[in-house]
Amino acid sequence: MKKILRFASALLCGAMLLCSLSVTAFAENDDEVYDFDPNTDKIYSEAVYMVNTDTGDVVYKKNESKKMYPASTTKIMTCIIALEHLSEGALSKKVEVPYDCFNDFYEDPNYSDPSNAAIEPLQDNLTYKDCLYALMLPSACEAANILAYNIGGGSITKFIGMMNEKAKELGCTGTNFVNAHGLHNDNRPIPATGC
């Protein structure tokens, strides 16, 4: 489980970097290393906070305190919390799929298509593993809510509290999760230094 958690944490860091920085490099062999130079390489992202994970040194920062919306990177934190609270044996257990897991985005006219996972309310054959796979699909918001509902003991709000506690534990500053899926919420921008 610790390997999975380390992998998920690395995935979170990688996703934050990918969302923050677009750098393309081609290596002819595995020994080649791309040297990023912020003085000569074009940075397309509006905000960046890049850290060398081996040394903890800040490699590059741009608008690091500017509040940005994290969108689907939120689902990576949802995945981390889920993996921390589920044993390998639990992955095959079925989950409850109540209407509560769908209401917050289908009742809001701002969310035109919050799902690509084709999960239906009251579906009775869905497992934790299915939800974790669906979670990584674009806009599979109901999968995030289903995980939050089930792991939070029937309370999505309780799960969101777990996400915020984990963010603090990881040293994320200025981070405040208000949902498990990352759909837009005016109360939720975080700075690039947030994670």
Give the label of every model feature segment.
Residues 1-31:
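Gram-positive cell-envelope targeting signals
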